Regions:
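Metal-cofactor-dependent catalytic cores
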Residues: 1-249
Length: 249
């Protein structure tokens, strides 16, 4: 059975991994997530491990760098420049930007472009605004939704925090004609990124502590794209649970 669970409240993409994101009114959803999302990342030249990407977990001020587009980019919705916290705009693939970030990090970095995206888990992350509000209440503050770095913020029909946990294993469809489909795969295990204020870069441990205390360190869900299509703010969202397994006679 398919039921309407809410609508798209906001859409976000993060062109450069761990840098500032951008809110968009609509976006194309492809097999590798939102067009232009996390296609770029800084590679740490001194890291030979399986996850060589520089993130705000290692350089918190990285979230204060803001990708910009100044004319045609390399392709799709990729940025052409990055604005530093001091307001200087540097070419996204220029040596000056790599040198600046490497200086702050303390070792050399190199900008990399991966067409399939650079994701920690799955290509799409979702959270409901009710969940964000509840975490804020538990943490004693009003956290900016950007702390959670979702691609899709959902305004649910019911005021039930953590309702998205119940969608794991099912499918969300977007729009009256099911333009796009996302299979919800698992809950989103959180890291220290949620402690960083996206406006100032200042850390506060209360948000992560609240998530650990009441939700086993999980808030929001991940999904994979099962049908490409267009997403737009205001689009209705429908949920269909996975079919119950049949018992053998």
């Amino acid at each position: 059975m398919t039921i309407e669970v809410g609508e798209v409240e906001a859409l976000f993409r993060y062109p450069v991994k761990s840098m500032g994101g951008e809110a968009v009114e609509e976006a194309e959803l492809g097999w590798h997530g939102l067009d232009g999302d996390r296609r770029l990342a800084f590679h740490r030249a001194d890291d030979r491990g399986g996850f060589p990407w520089l993130t705000a977990g290692k350089l918190p001020e990285l979230i204060l760098f803001a990708p910009q587009r100044r004319g045609p980019g390399v392709g799709g919705n990729l940025p052409t420049h990055v604005r530093t916290p001091e307001g200087k705009e540097l070419a996204v693939f220029g040596q000056e930007l790599a040198t600046e970030v490497g200086r702050r990090h303390g070792s050399p970095v190199e900008m990399m472009h991966l067409n399939r995206g650079i994701f920690d888990e799955a290509s799409v992350s979702l959270i409901t605004s009710v969940t964000v509000d509840e975490i804020g209440r538990l943490a004693g503050q009003r956290p900016d939704v950007r702390r959670f770095r979702p691609n899709i913020l959902i305004a649910t029909s019911r005021s039930v925090p953590f309702e998205e946990d119940d969608w794991v294993g099912g499918v969300l469809s977007f729009g009256e004609t099911s333009e796009a489909l996302i299979g919800i795969t698992n809950r989103d295990e959180r890291c220290s990124m949620v402690n960083l204020d996206p406006g100032s870069g200042r850390p506060s441990a209360e948000v992560l502590k609240a998530i650990v205390r009441v939700r086993d360190n999980r808030a929001g869900v991940y999904g994979t794209v099962t049908r490409r299509g267009r997403l737009a703010v205001g689009q209705p969202i429908f949920f269909e649970a996975a079919p119950e397994p049949r018992e053998r006679p």
